[in-house]
Amino acid sequence: MELLHSINDFNEAKQVIAGGVNSPVRAFKSVKGTPPFILKGKGAYLYDVDNNHYIDFVQSWGPLIFGHADEEIEENIINTLKKGTSFGAPTELETTLAKEIISCYEGLDKVRLVNSGTEATMSAIRLARAYSQKDDLIKFEGCYHGHSDSLLVKAGSGCVTFGSPSSLGVPNDFSKHTLVARYNDLNSTEECFKKGNVGCVIIEPIAGNMGLVPAQKEFLLGLKALCEKYQAVLILDEVMSGFRASLSGSQEFYGVVPDLVTFGKVIGAGLPLACFGGRAEIMDLLSPIGGVYQAGTLSGNPLAVCAGLSALYKIKRDKTLYTRLNALAIRLTQGLKKSAQSYNIALETLNRGSMFGFFFNENAVCDFDDALKSDTEMFAKFHQKMLFKGVYLACSSFETGFICEPMTEEMIDLVVAKADESFDEIIKGV
């Protein structure tokens, strides 16, 4: 396999696009490689400008549960496109999509459509602060909630210290109200509650940006109880896990009903769409009814709404979809682990529905500190081997992989065989 055209394209892109990419992870920096420049996608496959094709486990970082260029979704988008791309006015499609989302998630009375997960979490936090009338928020190490300033923070020397910016350009004043707790650690979380005037807590119930690390059930139930004890708004960030892990997102596994929730990715089926929602008494604080301002020129645009609605209709029609996707994810993760073990390579694997992850780590990963102990050099070698064997994996050991509906057992078995070849070559130093 060669990437000559991709190398040339990347060099050209770096002359006119900052870093050569429009989202940092796409640069393949952490795996010391060159990103293939993609020409098209179809089903489970990506095709690049060098005429290479790959089985794609990134799926645009999660949205494409039905794979690339699904014919039904594509046809509906084209029909909607002919009527106009954006109106900046209400449409019936928006109401229909809102009803479909609400019907799948307990405790969800109303939603507001936005364009990205970052907008959704940013707006949900603003709304939660207004409702609680308290400024401080708790987030968790390793959980990613978009790139708004108050959420780009990391823990200091201890989990109960106020956050400090982890990105240049973020003033301390923007992050001083953010406290960072240890994921899956209730003691750390309660210390944050005691230290600050906490109005809301935001968490990924199934974390996807430190690798795949699900919350422990007793932890999430305990977190809900702490929010009730300290009268704080609980926000579940299901931008990644919503309609991915199951039809009801994390609720399938935990049964936790939040005050607010955010969705994205799958509900846009590959077009820019996200939402936040929750109890009516909180959501009614939003303008134009209440005093919490949130707006967007392209929010609820008909193309994205149509794509998302088409995906949700397909999901609801297919009663065995999540069972099949889960089975494929288990087949993949178990196959990878068995192969690694045969070469005495430490590998921890897991899945939640169609989401999967693996760590080159001797122990189970329960939080961000555990994830950081993983062998990232081994991951980089493995990633490059697999890429050149036609398997497109997330280009960071701290990302999550995704199964899509067009994938088959035969594809999974082929990928496991290629992983076995890769492990063999790594051990032999080839």
Curated annotation (Swiss-Prot):
GO terms for molecular function: glutamate-1-semialdehyde 2,1-aminomutase activity; pyridoxal phosphate binding; transaminase activity. Pathway: Porphyrin-containing compound metabolism; protoporphyrin-IX biosynthesis; 5-aminolevulinate from L-glutamyl-tRNA(Glu): step 2/2. Its cofactor is pyridoxal 5'-phosphate. GO terms for cellular component: cytoplasm. Keywords: Cytoplasm, Isomerase, Porphyrin biosynthesis, Pyridoxal phosphate. The modification N6-(pyridoxal phosphate)lysine is found at K265. It catalyses: (S)-4-amino-5-oxopentanoate = 5-aminolevulinate. It is an enzyme of class 5 (isomerase). Gene3D superfamilies: Aspartate Aminotransferase, domain 1, Type I PLP-dependent aspartate aminotransferase-like (Major domain). InterPro entries: 4pyrrol_synth_GluAld_NH2Trfase (IPR004639), Aminotrans_3 (IPR005814), Aminotrans_3_PPA_site (IPR049704), PyrdxlP-dep_Trfase (IPR015424), PyrdxlP-dep_Trfase_major (IPR015421), PyrdxlP-dep_Trfase_small (IPR015422). The keyword Cytoplasm applies. Its EC number is 5.4.3.8. It comes from the Bacteria. Its main location: cytoplasm. CDD domains: OAT_like. PROSITE patterns: AA_TRANSFER_CLASS_3 (PS00600). Homodimer. Belongs to the class-III pyridoxal-phosphate-dependent aminotransferase family. HemL subfamily. HAMAP family: HemL_aminotrans_3. PANTHER family: GLUTAMATE-1-SEMIALDEHYDE 2,1-AMINOMUTASE (PTHR43713), GLUTAMATE-1-SEMIALDEHYDE 2,1-AMINOMUTASE 1, CHLOROPLASTIC-RELATED (PTHR43713:SF3). This is Glutamate-1-semialdehyde 2,1-aminomutase. It comes from Helicobacter pylori (strain HPAG1). The gene is hemL.
